[in-house]
A protein has these predicted regions:
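Intrinsically disordered, low-complexity non-transmembrane regions of multi-pass membrane transporters
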Residues: 1-4, 117-118, 216-224
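Helical membrane-embedded segments and adjacent short helical loop/helix-boundary regions
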Residues: 2-18, 31-37, 42-45, 152-173, ...
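Pore-lining transmembrane helices
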Residues: 6-99, 117
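Membrane-interface elements of multi-pass transporters and channels
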Residues: 28-29, 86-90, 147-152, 194, ...
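Alpha-helical transmembrane segments and their membrane-interface exit regions
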Residues: 44-48, 71-78, 162-168, 188-190, ...
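Helix-loop-helix junctions within the multi-pass membrane cores of secondary transporters/permeases
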Residues: 66-157
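Membrane-embedded alpha-helical modules
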Residues: 118-203, 210
Length: 224
């Protein structure tokens, strides 16, 4: 096992643990266990999944939930462009698999490696590690939800916010992400009393996407 593979598997397990919260909260939001697991297996991007169930659980429409999840998942397209040069797919099936596994963690582990072979190993170890553990722990959380009882009685009604913050926190190491996060939070709070459930988080996603697009030229210059 190479250093990149060890790093990828460690990241996979640590990230996968959040799946327990997702599974339990998905069921509490109105999904059944199979739907929760399917969402993890098919959508497979934590931020988008928590946004989806947050909107659904708050009474928002499926369209608003899907819109919020989609906007939060746009960043994976940018990752894909970067990884296409670092870890180019060798076949059509591999390209499809890499598209599914292109997330924050697999990209971070791949980019952190200096050796080209290690970049590929790191990507696959992190991508597959997160996928397996995320889906497995999502299933565990969905099944365990029936045994947990009322979420508010255990103080778990804020678990979605805490889990989402946990996913976001590692990305707030620079000034720009912090400013964007604060601005998105302000927009969300301002919209809560004024618009139907589900739309505030969609508004925050629009703000984040617009800010990312506005900073795109500078980002491209810094990575070239």
């Amino acid at each position: 096992v190479t250093p990149a593979q060890r790093a990828g598997l460690s990241v996979g397990f640590a990230t996968g643990l959040y799946g327990i919260s997702f599974g339990a909260l998905a069921v509490a939001s109105g999904l059944d266990a199979w739907q929760a697991v399917a969402l993890s297996a098919l959508m497979f991007t934590g931020g988008s999944q928590f946004a989806f169930i947050g909107v659904v659980g708050g009474g928002g429409s499926p369209a608003a939930a899907t819109g919020a999840a989609t906007l939060l998942g746009v960043r994976n397209t940018v990752y894909g462009l970067r990884l296409a040069t670092l870890v180019p797919p060798r076949s059509a099936p591999e390209r499809a698999a890499m598209a599914q596994l292109t997330i924050d963690e697999s990209t971070a582990v791949a980019v952190a490696q200096q050796d080209r072979a290690e970049q590929r190993r790191g990507f696959w170890a992190a991508g597959l590690g997160v996928y397996v553990f995320w889906v497995a722990f999502s299933a565990l959380g969905a099944v365990a939800d029936d045994r947990i009882g009322e979420l508010d009685a255990l103080g778990l009604d804020g678990a979605a916010v805490a889990a989402f913050t946990g996913l976001l926190w590692p990305h707030l190491s620079a000034r720009r992400p912090v400013v964007i996060a604060v601005l998105a939070a302000v927009v969300t709070l301002a919209l809560v009393p004024a618009v139907p459930a589900g739309l505030p988080i969609l508004g925050a996603a629009v703000v984040a996407a617009a800010a990312g697009w506005a900073s795109r030229p500078e980002t491209l210059r810094s990575t070239s």
